[in-house]
Amino acid sequence: MDSRYNPAILEEKWQKTWVELGLDKTQTQSNKPKFYALSMFPYPSGSLHMGHVRNYTITDVIARLKRMQGYRVLHPMGWDAFGLPAENAAIDRGVPPANWTYQNITQMRQQLQRLGLSIDWDSEVATCSPDYYKWTQWIFLQFLQAGLAYQKEAAVNWDPIDQTVLANEQVDNEGRSWRSGAIVERKLLRQWFLKITDYAEELLNDLDKLTGWPERVKLMQANWIGKSVGAYLEFPIVGSTEKIAVYTTRPDTVYGVSYVVLAPEHPLTKQVTSKTQQAVVDTFIQEVTNQSELERTAEDKPKRGVATGGKAINPFTGEEVPIWIADYVLYEYGTGAVMGVPAHDVRDFKFAQRYDLPIDFVIAAPDDVAGFDLSPTSETEEVTQVVQIEYNQAYTEPGILINSGAFTGMTSTDAKQAIVKYATEKGFGKERIQYRLRDWLISRQRYWGAPIPVIHCPNCGIVPVPDKDLPVILPEEVEFTGRGGSPLAQLESWVNVPCPTCGSPAKRETDTMDTFIDSSWYFLRFTDARNEAQVFESAKTNDWMPVDQYVGGIEHAILHLLYSRFFTKVLRDRGLLNFDEPFERLLTQGMVQGLTYFNPNKGGKDKWVPSHLVNPNDPRDPQTGEPLQRLYATMSKSKGNGVAPEDVIAKYGVDTARMFILFKAPPEKDLEWDEADVEGQFRFLNRVWRLVTDYVASGVNPKNKSGELSKSEKDLRRAIHSAIQSVTEDLEDEYQFNTAISELMKLSNALTDANGKDSRVYAEGIHTLVVLLAPFAPHIAEELWQLLGNSESVHTQTWPAFDPAALVADEITLVIQVNGKKRADIQVPSQADKAELEKYARESEVVQRHLEGKEIKKVIVVPGKLVNFVVG
């Protein structure tokens, strides 16, 4: 037996043994309750970072715990393997995307296996594998059959030099292409969408079912769905039979409309534009349509517009108001038109100030209209009194309506209902529920993604690829230049096919799917990953789902999680699933931060100095010698503050890295990397190693004493079972790994300080410590368990249950106070009642001295804690 803790040797040994034993394979015993533990699968970039290590360690602890608690556990891993980086690698290095991706997968799989994670690799999937994207394509066809997939024109980022579509991340802050440097244009292309809006109400309402999700994530999703109840109103165009439809959540402000705004893409722009304004409007539209949505709606940019020369009629007042076109109105939102009410909307207020448009206040704060008579003179008359109230900024709060005809004097709440009712009766409006959520654009004009499985036939239209012809395989004989649009569209031998329905010459769809499609159902495939006959066997998937614990970053709070919920509901409605939500509990782990240096005189936080170039004891700019400032920031290559997992493992071992990551911060908080704290965890594991190996080396044979345990034995047994209780609660309730490890440290200290190391209680403590340590530091726990003479794996042991009787102390410490000041503490029987506690307190010699000659006015007894004498 080696007296030294050598993590490198024992970790390699046990990882190999666990594979041979099949210890991590998914158990299928139906008599056990199931537990599905899942981390969000990674993109195969080729190297793990500390964020990965934290994510997968958290899930691994949970999976190991649940196995020991008697659950059959599914803990799989896969690869979110389609995406732009592989295509860029093909362009830059001449390496086929598949080669680059699979090479990275091999490398990262080895890195993950080096972490000793209890992953069932038999369930591994890669979204770029035809075995996987065959079923991605099949699911798309389910959407198509259900009427949930359709095509329409939508704007894309277009590089006019390379003649190709760009992703948003390929456009820099100046609106230029990352590769050619050309100013990016907006271009309309026919694209595929999924009707997620059909599920908007259910996606919103079912957030209430997600009691195991962080509230902030649910709020983010609710805001993204963006349900609002408002009014649909029609403004007739002067000189035309057409009407401009607007949607507003503030119909109570309609009497304050001073202009109407159309989106530049609105089909009525040509009709409302006068001849004198045509050239100005055309120029403006050209400028705006080349801007991204983010640019147009950015809060910090002034909103721009141009008058069309046309006018619309406010249906409530009969007054004509000018029609404008503005960059901040998007055709995809609402009706593509808004009513401008500058007095009661901040954005409209700034726009009106910039273009000198009227600002008419029609709502006022209740206190500001207290002196006005806003009652109609009769039931048939309107309030005629004009209320002159102005504010120096937009008044956006609810209030009392003024200068609003028959609705003057009403509260905003009452007026909204009355105005919508009036508009409905008159036929120029109605109540309307609207969502911020828009249908999901899934088309990508790129190669490295799942091909959309449809064929375009001049006779039959859109024809689904028959199931027997799936998957539509990505061709390998493709040239990657970064120019000329989608590589697939340029490969005629792949594009040109006969129509499956009529046999006429037809063409394949050349768009591939958004990679979010792949990750919207992978958790379902894990439950039946080797099924070649169907997407998954419903009985298996319904058995394992929903995922009991999902772990991933807050950056996926909206899109990935929302799309996964959407897919689950659609597949449920297609009869494949029998549950509503995919993820029972969600843990969004914090970021891993490293110490970062910057020179405040040389670009500040925009110019980081790599930490390996800095002396941490005297941080100075290596070029100028100037003092550097430091802060903790998320680890990244650009900041030069990353810590390579393999370096930490080589120096300290996997278990130390796990222990540090789990101990340093609660899982939902950001974690600051600190080498000194890593050392601290290494020292703790060394102490545990010595504690157990010394016990084994002593060769003691625990005495099988009969009768009462000694006081020291009772105290030690109390410490043991207190640790069991605390660690279990910390792991089951809120996953407070840091406090659970603190309890292990307490138990270790109690065992170190204990007398009677030949007692059965001490043996119980040693064995319990190793078992409790197993989910956190699996390798050292396994080695120590074997050294203790056990033949079976520690990870197959039953998780210990605490004995409530062991937690009850024979004696407790009673604090005695006089007038609230502590004067003594004494040991008393734990079962003593109030009268007995007061008696013991009065008998204390120290207290008697403080009570001598004084009148006791009151005695306060708090059972199990204190006695307080109030004296005069």
Curated annotation (Swiss-Prot):
NCBIfam families noted in UniProt: leuS_bact
Similarity comment text for this entry: Belongs to the class-I aminoacyl-tRNA synthetase family.
Key word Protein biosynthesis present: yes
Domain of life: Bacteria
Classification via InterPro entries: aa-tRNA-synth_I_CS (IPR001412), aa-tRNA-synth_Ia (IPR002300), Leu-tRNA-ligase (IPR002302), Leu_tRNA-synth_edit (IPR025709), M/V/L/I-tRNA-synth_anticd-bd (IPR013155), Methionyl/Leucyl_tRNA_Synth (IPR015413), Rossmann-like_a/b/a_fold (IPR014729), tRNAsynth_Ia_anticodon-bd (IPR009080)
GO MF, one example: ATP binding
Name the record gives this protein: Leucine--tRNA ligase
UniProt KW Cell inner membrane keyword: no
Organism: Trichormus variabilis (strain ATCC 29413 / PCC 7937)
GO annotation terms (biological process): leucyl-tRNA aminoacylation
A single Gene Ontology CC term: cytosol
